């Protein structure tokens, strides 16, 4: 999301990069771009070629991967050219297109994290009822909503830029922050509101999970086999929710068979007669859930928060930053598109198997 404001000539007067510096920067950014492209392609191919992954929750992850792939293919390469050349030489029209695609895709990527968190929240707090509502059509509607909101957030500058052909100047491709209201509107809609929602949702998810773990740990004996099946379903449901891609469909009874067959962590059962043992397993699961949620939230916040703090500070004319700082913070945000496919699939066994299958197919071709 390349939204930079260089308000004074002094802010533009920076030391030119040496050839060595340009080469190092270029190689680093090319590696990031390549990895982002390959990892997101792998997620898309894994979901597309693995029938077991054809679930509504994974459609959201696939859409996130498509969005991050667009960032890698359409946004990052032009940013590399711009940074290495120290000036924009690709014309006014391409500048307009690039800025619009940049803002739309980055905003859409962030909003995808929001709907994934919302999907998980509903899945863990209202598992049975939401399993019936969790369909491909609902996932498609959520994806369409995300793209619509992203367009409404990122497109307004096109309307006033069309009347200002001399700004930005031909050598620069930046969005000028002379509309304070839009700066506040765009930063709130693209980051601060989604961040607040994500924090609230994952906080509630963690406490709901902790409560379920404690309830599981406190039950000494299961009354009958039917009750055991229901509790096992809840345990599997919970585990898969925190393993990032849960497998709920519209039919909870058939999904129980899949959960029961694929669960890796055994539920609390009659063998755990000692309260200390039950408490230890419950605490282990709580720590694992907290660790995964911490990684997801930490990666998102560390990637994008510095950029959007800079946007508000610069947009409100509190402080100006150099182009190097602006570029660094922009690429720190882009790196989130590299991290997303790792975080949202690495904790799931079915994704791991799908990736191994793709690698084996690649070796045989």
UniProtKB/Swiss-Prot annotation:
A motif (DRY motif) lies at residues 119-121. It is found in: Cell membrane. Detected in brain. One of its GO terms (cellular component) is dendrite. It holds the Pfam family 7tm_1. PROSITE patterns: G_PROTEIN_RECEP_F1_1, G_PROTEIN_RECEP_F1_2. Its main location: membrane. GO terms for biological process: adenylate cyclase-inhibiting G protein-coupled receptor signaling pathway; adenylate cyclase-inhibiting serotonin receptor signaling pathway; chemical synaptic transmission; G protein-coupled receptor signaling pathway; G protein-coupled receptor signaling pathway, coupled to cyclic nucleotide second messenger. It comes from the Eukaryota. Residues 1-21, 85-92, 158-179, 317-322 are extracellular. Residues 46-59, 119-138, 204-291, 346-365 are cytoplasmic. It is a multi-pass membrane protein. G-protein coupled receptor for 5-hydroxytryptamine (serotonin). Also functions as a receptor for various alkaloids and psychoactive substances. Ligand binding causes a conformation change that triggers signaling via guanine nucleotide-binding proteins (G proteins) and modulates the activity of downstream effectors, such as adenylate cyclase. HTR1E is coupled to G(i)/G(o) G alpha proteins and mediates inhibitory neurotransmission by inhibiting adenylate cyclase activity. This is 5-hydroxytryptamine receptor 1E.
């Amino acid at each position: 999301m390349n939204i930079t404001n260089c308000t004074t000539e002094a802010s533009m007067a920076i030391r030119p990069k040496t050839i060595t510096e340009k080469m190092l920067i270029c190689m680093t950014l090319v590696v990031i771009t390549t990895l982002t492209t390959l990892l997101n392609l792998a997620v898309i191919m894994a979901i597309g070629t693995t029938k077991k992954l054809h679930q509504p929750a994974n459609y959201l992850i696939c859409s996130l991967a498509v969005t991050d792939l667009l960032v890698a293919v359409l946004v990052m390469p032009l940013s590399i050219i711009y940074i290495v050349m120290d000036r924009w030489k690709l014309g006014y029209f391409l500048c307009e297109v690039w800025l619009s695609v940049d803002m739309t895709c980055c905003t859409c990527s962030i909003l995808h994290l929001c709907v994934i968190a919302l999907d998980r929240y509903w899945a863990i707090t209202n598992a049975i009822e939401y399993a019936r509502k969790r369909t491909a059509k609902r996932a498609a509607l959520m994806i369409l909503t995300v793209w619509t909101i992203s367009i409404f957030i990122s497109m307004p500058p096109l309307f006033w830029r069309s009347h200002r052909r001399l700004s930005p100047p031909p050598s620069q491709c930046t969005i000028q922050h002379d509309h304070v209201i839009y700066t506040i509107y765009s930063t709130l809609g693209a980051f601060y509101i989604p961040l607040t929602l994500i924090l609230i949702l994952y906080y509630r998810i963690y406490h709901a999970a902790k409560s379920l773990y404690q309830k599981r740990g406190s039950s000494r004996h299961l009354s009958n086999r039917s009750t055991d099946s229901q509790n096992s379903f809840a345990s599997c449901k919970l585990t898969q929710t925190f393993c990032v891609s849960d497998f709920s469909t519209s039919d909870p009874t058939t999904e129980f068979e899949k959960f029961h067959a694929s669960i890796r962590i055994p539920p609390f059962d009659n063998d755990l007669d000692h309260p200390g043992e039950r408490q230890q397993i419950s605490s282990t699961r709580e720590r694992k859930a907290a660790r995964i949620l911490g990684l997801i939230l930490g990666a998102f916040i560390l990637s994008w928060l510095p950029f959007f703090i800079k946007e508000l500070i610069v947009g409100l004319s509190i402080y100006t930053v150099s182009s190097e700082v602006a570029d660094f913070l922009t690429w720190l945000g882009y790196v989130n598109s590299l991290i997303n496919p790792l975080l949202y699939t690495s904790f799931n066994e079915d994704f791991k198997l799908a990736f191994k299958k793709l690698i084996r197919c690649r070796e045989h071709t």
